[in-house]
C-alpha cells in the first residue's frame, strides 16, 4: 500500500507461500514457548503467534527484506476477515464468480470456514486475493466524508479487538499509530490494566470458527495500596457437531494429514497453546482449569512473564480457566481483557465491578 499526499493505492497481493522459504528471525524464548506439541518454525505463517504486534511487525519486515520485493517500508498494516467484513458493510456487497454474495454479515464466516468447504487449497488463495483486493481498493477509493467517518470509527473498534493493526517504523509518527492503539501488544500499561489471554491452534486445521469463548471478570477487592483484585473465568467450547464432523475435510478437522508430521490431536479436537499475561506491574495467581489441560509452565517471552499450557477441546466439550488477577497500584481504570481475535465483534465478556469503586 502506498500513500502520496492523501492518495492511497493498493499494490499486488502475494500468497504467504512465496515467503515461507525465507526463514525466520525468532528468539530462543519465542521458540521455547512454541516448541510443542506443534513446533512453530516462525516462518511468515507463524508470526502472529507472538502477541506483541511491535515484535510481529519487526519479524515481518525482516522477511520482506529477504524477498525479491525488498525495499524500505514505512510500517506494517495487518487485517483479518472481520476487518474485511466491516469494510464490505461500508462499501457494499461483493459477488463472486460462482454467484455467491459476500455481505457485511457473512464475509468473515466465508473466509474463516465456508471457503474451506467450497474450494480446494489452490483455489482458496485466488479467492482470498480477490476478496481482499476488492475490499481494500473499495475502502480507499471514491472517498466521501461520511465514508471516511465510518471507516475511521470502524478502525478504532477493530484495532481494540485486534482485527486491525497499523504500525510505523518512524519514531516521529508512532504517536499516531502505536500511541493511538492501532498496534496492540500484550499488556504493557500499569495505569490502564489488561489481562491478556491468547490462543494458538496446535492441531493443524481450520477449527477456529467452531470455538466459542465466554469470559467473566469480577472485581473482588480494592486494595489499600491502590491496586485491585479480580476473579477471571475464561471458557472455550468446541461447537463442532457430529454432522459437521462427518462432512468436513481433514483440512478443516486436522488430525492425520498429508505433509503434517505426527498427530497432535484427533480430527475435530482443537489443541490450543494458551498464553496468560498479567497486567503490567500486576500478577496472576491461583490458575486452575477444568477439562483436558496439560503441561502448565511459567515462561518469559519478549521481556514479559507469562503462564502457558495446552488445552485439548474435543467436539462438544468445554475447557474453563479460573484465576485471580491483581493490578498495579498505579491502575487508574478497570481491568479489561485483551485476547486473540475471533470471527465476530461480540467478545462475550461480562464485567462486574460492583464490589468496590476505584479510589
Regions found by a protein language model. Give the residues of each.
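Non-catalytic, solvent-exposed segments at the cell envelope interface
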Residues: 1-348, 356-358
Amino acid at each position: 500500500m502506498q500513500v502520496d499526499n492523501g492518495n492511497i493505492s493498493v499494490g499486488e497481493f502475494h500468497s504467504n507461500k512465496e515467503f515461507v522459504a525465507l526463514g525466520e528471525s525468532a528468539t530462543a524464548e519465542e521458540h521455547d514457548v512454541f516448541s510443542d506439541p506443534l513446533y512453530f518454525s516462525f516462518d511468515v505463517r507463524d508470526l502472529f503467534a507472538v502477541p506483541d504486534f511491535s515484535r510481529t511487525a519487526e519479524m515481518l519486515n525482516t522477511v520482506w527484506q529477504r524477498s525479491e520485493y525488498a525495499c524500505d517500508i514505512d510500517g506494517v498494516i495487518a487485517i483479518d476477515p472481520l476487518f474485511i467484513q466491516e469494510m464490505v458493510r461500508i462499501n457494499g456487497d461483493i459477488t463472486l464468480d460462482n454467484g455467491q454474495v459476500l455481505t457485511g454479515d457473512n464475509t468473515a464466516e466465508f473466509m474463516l470456514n465456508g471457503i474451506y468447504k467450497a474450494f480446494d487449497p489452490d483455489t482458496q488463495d485466488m479467492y482470498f486475493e480477490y476478496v481482499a483486493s476488492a475490499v481494500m481498493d473499495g475502502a480507499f477509493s471514491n472517498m466521501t466524508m461520511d465514508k471516511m467517518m465510518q471507516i475511521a470509527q470502524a478502525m478504532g473498534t477493530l484495532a481494540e479487538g485486534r482485527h486491525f493493526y497499523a504500525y510505523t517504523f518512524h519514531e516521529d509518527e508512532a504517536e499516531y499509530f502505536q500511541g493511538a492503539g492501532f498496534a496492540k501488544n500484550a499488556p504493557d500499561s500499569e495505569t490502564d490494566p489488561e489481562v491478556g489471554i491468547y490462543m494458538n491452534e496446535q492441531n493443524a486445521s481450520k477449527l477456529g470458527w467452531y470455538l466459542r469463548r465466554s469470559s467473566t471478570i469480577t472485581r473482588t477487592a480494592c486494595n489499600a495500596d491502590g491496586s485491585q483484585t479480580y476473579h477471571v473465568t475464561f471458557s472455550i467450547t468446541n461447537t463442532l457437531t457430529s454432522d459437521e464432523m462427518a462432512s468436513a475435510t481433514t483440512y478443516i478437522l486436522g488430525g492425520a494429514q498429508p505433509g503434517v508430521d505426527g498427530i497432535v490431536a484427533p480430527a475435530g479436537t482443537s489443541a490450543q497453546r494458551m498464553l496468560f499475561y498479567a497486567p503490567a506491574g500486576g500478577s496472576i495467581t491461583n490458575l486452575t482449569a477444568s477439562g483436558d489441560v496439560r503441561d502448565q509452565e511459567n515462561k518469559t517471552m519478549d521481556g514479559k512473564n507469562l503462564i502457558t499450557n495446552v488445552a485439548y477441546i474435543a467436539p462438544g466439550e468445554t475447557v474453563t480457566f479460573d484465576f485471580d488477577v491483581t493490578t498495579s497500584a498505579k491502575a487508574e481504570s478497570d481491568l479489561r481483557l485483551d485476547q486473540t481475535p475471533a470471527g465476530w465483534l461480540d467478545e462475550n465478556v461480562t464485567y462486574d465491578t460492583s464490589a468496590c469503586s476505584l479510589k
